[in-house]
């Protein structure tokens, strides 16, 4: 970015306990009086209140502009975006269980796009969400109250998922967490469906086939680990072995995260890197048990 990093901050806020099964986290992003250009990684769905400023995101041949409130459907690849400051954004990062329970929309059909509140929510809650930016600007609600209001909207919008659908989501997440290169047969064996049905349901809840989903999470997982300081050599070697060669590693990480290994280094200076960490991407255990032991983490803490 010309002139160096714009003055901005990214604050994660823990989701309320009752919403923890559905959300990665809440967050507040602030930008000073400058333009900020970056790339958002292939990330889960977001509910957003753009309280100040305006942003744009590139979706293939279309540039979409933000509104006061909107949903960002789950991303299947990294996307370029630009924000004109000053800006303040409030967000709820919705994991794949939450997206299915809140929206009821197939990720195969709705991904990599902005959605108006009425596409996801019933009319009353959609109107409430759309009015939050104006209420914040008028001083009727502060930061904490706005996030609380977003949580209330999510609570009102959640529906109960069939147990078999929850099984597909949770078993797929467990499978993705098990290895850099999990075996497809292991996934199919864990699901109460035929191979063809399993592929269709994985695409419905995650937007991509199991084969492509492995590519996506392998890249995100590798990017997360490479962004950590003092990465043990054994883990770095495991990352290298998961890709054909260095060129393949760079290509995959760039496609799914918008980063290169150099830009992921500690101190590289992008708050968007924080979204690749466990606070921002907690629906999948990005650290398998072997990596967790070497990093001194309890793998259960990464969910």
Segment roles from a protein language model:
Residues 202-208, 252-262:
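A secondary-structure capping/hinge motif
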Residues 215:
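Short, conserved glycine- and acidic-residue-centered signature motifs
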Residues 1-170, 176-185, 191-195, 209, ...:
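Alpha-helical bundle regulatory/interaction domains
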């Amino acid at each position: 970015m010309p002139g160096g990093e714009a003055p901005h901050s990214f604050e994660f806020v823990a989701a309320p306990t009752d919403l923890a099964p559905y959300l990665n986290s809440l967050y507040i992003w602030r930008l000073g009086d400058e333009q900020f250009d970056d790339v958002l990684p292939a990330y889960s769905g977001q509910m957003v209140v753009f309280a100040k400023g305006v942003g744009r995101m590139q979706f293939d041949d279309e540039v979409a502009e933000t509104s006061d409130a909107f949903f960002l459907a789950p991303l299947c690849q990294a996307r370029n975006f630009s924000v004109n400051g000053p800006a303040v954004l409030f967000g709820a990062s919705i994991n794949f269980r939450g997206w299915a329970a809140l929206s009821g929309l197939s990720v195969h059909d709705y991904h990599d796009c902005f959605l108006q509140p009425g596409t996801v929510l019933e009319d009353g809650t959609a109107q409430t969400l759309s009015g939050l930016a104006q209420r914040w600007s008028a001083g009727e609600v502060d930061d904490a109250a706005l996030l609380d209001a977003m949580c209330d909207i999510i609570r009102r919008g959640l529906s109960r998922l069939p147990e078999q659908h929850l099984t597909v989501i949770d078993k797929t997440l467990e499978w993705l967490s098990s290895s850099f290169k999990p075996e497809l047969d292991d996934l199919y064996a864990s699901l109460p469906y035929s191979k063809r049905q399993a592929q269709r349901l994985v695409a419905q809840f995650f937007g991509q086939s199991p084969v492509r989903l492995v590519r996506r999470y392998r890249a995100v997982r590798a990017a997360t680990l490479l962004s950590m300081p003092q990465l043990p050599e054994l883990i770095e070697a495991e990352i290298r072995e998961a890709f054909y060669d260095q060129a393949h590693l760079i290509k995959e990480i760039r496609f799914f995260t918008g980063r290169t290994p150099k830009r992921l280094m500690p101190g590289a200076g992008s708050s968007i890197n924080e979204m690749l960490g466990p606070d921002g991407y907690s629906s999948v255990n990005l650290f398998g048990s072997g990596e967790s032991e070497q990093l001194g983490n309890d793998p259960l803490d990464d969910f």
